[in-house]
C-alpha cells in the first residue's frame, strides 16, 4: 500500500503536531509546578545537586549560576556555565534536582566531547543565521511563486538547516536526561518515588523536543511538496 501525502495533508499533520505540542508543554509546566512543591528527601538545593554532580564527574571549570525566568535553565558550552532559573537554583524539591542534573548532563557531554553536542554547538550560529532569514525568503517565495521558485527554494534550504538542528537536539537531550536520572538514583539524591517523578518530568521534556522535530520535518516536506507541484504544472 502506497501512502501519498500532498501539501494539504502535511499542513493538517503539522497543525495536529502543533496542538499536541501545546498539550505536552502544558502538562510539562503543570508537572514541574507540582514537583516543585514536593520536598526532596536529601534536602539539597538545585545548585547543590548541580555542583555535586559536576565535582563527582571531575568537572571543576564549570560554574553554576542563577538566571531569571521560568524553565530558562540551560548549559552554555561557550561560557561553561550551568544556568539555573532562580526556582531551580534555590529549590529543594524533585523538579529542581531533576532539572539541575539534566543541565549538568550537558556539561558532562561537553567534558567528554560528546559528538552530537559538538556538532550542535558548531551548528548553532549557522542555525541562528538560517532562522533569521528563512521567514523572509519563504514569504517572498510565496509572493513570487508565479514568477520564480528560487526565493522559496532558498527558504526551503534555510528551513532544512533548522530542521536538521531540531533532530540533532534529540540525542543531546535524551542522553543528558539519562545521565541525570542515572546519577541522581546512584547517589541517593532522590528516593524511589522521587525518581519516578523526576523520570516522568524529564520524559515529558524530551517529548517536546521530539514533537518540535516532527513538526519541523512535516512543514519542510509540505514546502517541498508545494515546489514540486508547481514544477509539475
Each model region followed by its residue ranges:
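Hydrophobic transmembrane alpha-helical segments that form the core helix bundle
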Residues: 126-177
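Hydrophobic alpha-helical transmembrane segments of integral membrane proteins
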Residues: 14, 134, 148, 155, ...
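Hydrophobic alpha-helical transmembrane segments of small proteolipidic membrane proteins, enriched
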Residues: 1-31, 141, 153-154
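Short, flexible micro-motifs
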Residues: 13, 24, 49, 144, ...
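Membrane-interfacial hairpin junctions
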Residues: 1-3, 143-149, 231
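Polar-ligand-bearing catalytic/cofactor-coordination segments
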Residues: 2-4, 26-130, 164-233
Amino acid at each position: 500500500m502506497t501512502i501519498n501525502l500532498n501539501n494539504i495533508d502535511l499542513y493538517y499533520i503539522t497543525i495536529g503536531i502543533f496542538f499536541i505540542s501545546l498539550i505536552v508543554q502544558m502538562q510539562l509546566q503543570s508537572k514541574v509546578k507540582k514537583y516543585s512543591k514536593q520536598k526532596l528527601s536529601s534536602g539539597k538545593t538545585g545548585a547543590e545537586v548541580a555542583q555535586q554532580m559536576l565535582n563527582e564527574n571531575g568537572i571543576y571549570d564549570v560554574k553554576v549560576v542563577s538566571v531569571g525566568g521560568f524553565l530558562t535553565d540551560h548549559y552554555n558550552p561557550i561560557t561553561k556555565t550551568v544556568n539555573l532559573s532562580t526556582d531551580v537554583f534555590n529549590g529543594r524539591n524533585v523538579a529542581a534536582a531533576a532539572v539541575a542534573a539534566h543541565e549538568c548532563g550537558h556539561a558532562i557531554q561537553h567534558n567528554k566531547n560528546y559528538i552530537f553536542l559538538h556538532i550542535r554547538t558548531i551548528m548553532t550560529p549557522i542555525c541562528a543565521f538560517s532562522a533569521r532569514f528563512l521567514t523572509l525568503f519563504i514569504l517572498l517565495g510565496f509572493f513570487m511563486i508565479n514568477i520564480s521558485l528560487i526565493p522559496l527554494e532558498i527558504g526551503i534550504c534555510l528551513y532544512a538547516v533548522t530542521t536538521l538542528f531540531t533532530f540533532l537536539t534529540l540525542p543531546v537531550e535524551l542522553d543528558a536526561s539519562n545521565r541525570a536520572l542515572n546519577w541522581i538514583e546512584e547517589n541517593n539524591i532522590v528516593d524511589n518515588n522521587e525518581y519516578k517523578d523526576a523520570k516522568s518530568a524529564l520524559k515529558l521534556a524530551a517529548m517536546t523536543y521530539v514533537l518540535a522535530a516532527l513538526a519541523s520535518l512535516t512543514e519542510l516536506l509540505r514546502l517541498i511538496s508545494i515546489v514540486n507541484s508547481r514544477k509539475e504544472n
